[in-house]
Amino acid sequence: SEYHVFDSKSKSFKVSEDKKAEFFKRKKESLLNTLAEKADTIKSGLLAGYPQTEIESFYRQEKEALAWVNDKNSDTPMLKQVARVRGVPFEVLVEKVIAKASQFAVAIGVIIGQRQAFEDRLLATKTLEELTALEKEIEEWTFQAN
């Protein structure tokens, strides 16, 4: 394995504790990166079907909708145009934007919580066996609202 060295005296391979520790550290770091990528992939799955331009406007849409709910005189140039061009009442669009933003916030909260729980477990692993088992769980991780 990657952490064995050949011992010329005994003419056999022995575990190098230094190499084993380094291998374990590298594997943990790699799994931490894999975990971050997996979280991004799961988030991207939630956004499937939305063009990037629209995704980039989500924060602005929510900000305008919430401002209008709090003050009907608030400036809402983006939402006014979306409602006009889409042909839906402005108030209906505001409700939809707020509802979608809330749903998305909950979903992202679940993903973040799941990722952080995996990270906590990853940082606490002490053995290669624990690390391998956790790696399998991370590979199988899918979005589940709990």
Predicted regions and their residues:
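A preference for well-ordered globular domain cores
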Residues: 1-146
